[in-house]
Amino acid sequence: MKQNKFRCINGCLMFVVLILLTACQPTPEEEIVVNKGDGALEIKLQATPVPPEEAQAFAVPDCWQETLEIGDSRVVFDAAVECPVTAFPVFEVEEASFTAQTVNEALARLAPDAERVWLAGTSSEELNEELAAAIRGWWYDDGLGGGHYGPYEGQEEDITRLQQQLANAVDESAPYAPFESLPVKHTVLCADGRSITVYAYDDCWAFTIDLGHAAVMQGERLVATGGAMGNEPPGTEIGEVSVTPEQAVEQAQAMLETLGYAGMQVASVEKARMVNAVTAEVLTNGYQLILCRGDGGYAPFDSLLLGHSALQIHEPLAYRKAWRPERMQMFVDERGVRYVEQMYPIRVLRTVSGNAQLLPFARVQELLRNRFRHEFRWTEVSGATVTVKRVALVGALVRVKNDLERAYIVPAWLCEYTTDTGSAPDQRYAIAVNAIDGTNVDVKLA
């Protein structure tokens, strides 16, 4: 069975690297620059905010349709232009640390009726499941659409360990009390009959509701590759789902309100299933929702789904902090939210500008064209076609001058694209420019 080690991150991310060789070519007309922390951005942010009535006049086209020829390669712009807001705030943020208190506060909102608790994976039922799986062995794919279960390295040790744990298992819970330290690997029993398995570490936490300690989420794209569970062939589909995507989004938004989280928006919705990673049993079908930062109403985007591309300019390590994108995942079926996870939270410290002055969109278009021209002229790419699939005003992270611990969330124009030079035609990449000063934004940091 395909599965990740459970540190709150479910799913499989594939990174496709385009190898482009540098060639001696004429210098592009316009230099492509990143925010170098020289204070220029701060000066713009200190300017008087644009009055709200003027913000209404900021106009963008409904779509961008254009073909840009660059030698024998081309960039096809064929995308709607997303500008979901009419005012453009800038925020200052810092990373928020995970502690046991973080988990306790979230659990208090989700399960105020928590009564009992036990260490996850230690009940007789759970240990028997794991022992049966260890005796069965691992699944080995024969590459011909079949396969078999067989022994694996360390199998005998696992069987012996589980037999000893089973012999000493005590199926008793203790009165619930707030957790004192991380990591947390417990199952909480509630007065209303719910069972919530809690996993929490120093960079994430996850709650699984009424699905057991071994439940993992598998999205439709992962399942379709085959082998996600046992001998499932390529093209495997997730079965019927008794909830609509719209209902799933409503449930996710309600969960955000329950947890008291602001600034998160739904970035994607995908059919998914929850499976028992030990017994290889499908537990329920529903939808996986990815939620990302959308402070100020900016369009959310999931940088973890964007591949690494040589067309994307990365800031040197000396110029940046390796910020990790705050991200949440939820699984929703007809019973509601059954799984919720948070990774790498950030804290908004203040609003730097309530309505920053943006560059005209025509200027943004020229900057993005120049980005593509710059890369194609300095690389030996022949006959490539890049297709721009999405253009959106997002909130992106850029550093604060002379401060490694804080960053700004600024409006940035994100340009997602695919390329016919890679092995995965549906893999998306992205470039972005700061909508305030036109400098490059490294989207893999945002």
Predicted regions and their residues:
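A short, surface-exposed interaction/processing loop segment used at functional sites
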Residues: 205-242, 323-358, 428-446
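Segments that shape or occlude catalytic/ligand-binding pockets
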Residues: 248-424
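Preferential activation on post-signal-peptide N-terminal prodomains/segments
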Residues: 24-320
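N-terminal secretory signal peptides that target proteins for export/translocation
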Residues: 1-6
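Activation/maturation switch segments at domain boundaries
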Residues: 29-41, 395-446
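Sec-dependent N-terminal signal peptides of Gram-positive bacterial secreted proteins and lipoproteins
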Residues: 7-28
